[in-house]
Amino acid sequence: MSTVAAARYGKDNVRVYKVHKDPKTGVQTVTEMTVCVLLEGEIDTSYTKADNSVIVATDSIKNTIFILAKQNPVTPPELFGSILGTHFINKYKHIHVAHTNIITHRWTRLNIDGKPHSHSFVRDSEETRNVQVDVTEGVGIDIKSSINKLTVLKSTGSQFWGFVRDEYTTLPEVWDRILSTDVEATWAWKRFSGLDEVRGNVPKFDETWEAARNITLKTFAEEESASVQATMYKMGEQILAYQPLLETVEYSLPNKHYFEIDLSWHKGLKNTGKDAEVFVPQTNPNGLIKCTVGRKSKAKL
């Protein structure tokens, strides 16, 4: 006999753009998001009995996202995700969990003649600010915030040596190499009791995102990196130290390789070791290094 082991459904790829117009200054601020909302609850019969009476139409979910975006602030995204999730579990008594994922796309205000423009923006990278908000009836609100697609490179200040060498090893040890990666950093907040507690901590979300981004960039640039592993751990340590409300910080960093080209075949042209200036960026394969940094448990007395 079969049963529904797990089920959720909703609306994905809901694109939302909101503009805030300051009536005093005329300055406009824009936010563009891609939103996904998935619901869980007493919905098994829609799968097992073809009973649509328990289904909140995904089109209605889409409409709700637009309406709540009009009625509420959409920044920080941690707050808007909490507003959305709380709405669904309060509105529909048979819905007990709402999962909201928000991707905020980058629009950076243009500077024209040295001054910030009032209403013009540029997408200067594919970097996004992401949140995952899970609202569970009777439990609370779990939030994960993240930076994604933050592409960085440094042309020196990285090394890799002392690793396992055996019959499978061809990689040479290096004391100076190019280091490049696409940063994916995620920090998990301690559980919030409800929407009011989230509202009470609103300033911390933007502050922590800024701090996490700055820590990531500063450590990447200044660290004489012995390995991606060592560098990402130092980043996570600093973010946890900055924000006491965080439980964990997770990094996922692909190691995007740049290989020297031996050009000695052309008239003895030197382009290896200390003479290397021309490299070939590699698309794949690439290294992939992951780490979750948490807090040490306090020993019980």
Swiss-Prot record:
What cellular component GO annotations does this protein have?
extracellular region; peroxisome
Q: What class of enzyme is it?
A: oxidoreductase
Concerning Gene3D superfamilies, the annotation shows:
Urate Oxidase (3.10.270.10)
Pathway in which the depicted protein is active: Purine metabolism; urate degradation; (S)-allantoin from urate: step 1/3
Which SUPFAM superfamilies does UniProt cross-reference here?
Answer: Tetrahydrobiopterin biosynthesis enzymes-like
Q: Where in the cell is it found?
A: Peroxisome
Q: What is its EC number?
A: 1.7.3.3
GO BP, sorted A to Z:
purine nucleobase catabolic process; urate catabolic process
Q: Which reaction does it catalyse?
A: urate + O2 + H2O = 5-hydroxyisourate + H2O2
> Which keywords does this Swiss-Prot/TrEMBL entry list?
Oxidoreductase, Peroxisome, Purine metabolism
**Transmembrane stretches, by residue range?**
none
> Where, by residue number, does urate bind?
58-59, 160, 177, 228-229, 255
Concerning PROSITE patterns, the annotation shows: URICASE
Active site at 11 (charge relay system), 58 (charge relay system), 257 (charge relay system)
Q: Which GO terms describe its molecular function?
A: urate oxidase activity
Q: Per the Swiss-Prot or TrEMBL record, what residue ranges does the short sequence motif Microbody targeting signal cover?
A: 299-301
Q: Which domain of life is it from?
A: Eukaryota
| NCBIfam families documented for this protein | urate_oxi
This molecule's function is given as: Catalyzes the oxidation of uric acid to 5-hydroxyisourate, which is further processed to form (S)-allantoin.
State the similarity comment. Answer: Belongs to the uricase family.
User: This protein is called what?
Assistant: Uricase
Q: Which organism is it from?
A: Emericella nidulans (strain FGSC A4 / ATCC 38163 / CBS 112.46 / NRRL 194 / M139)
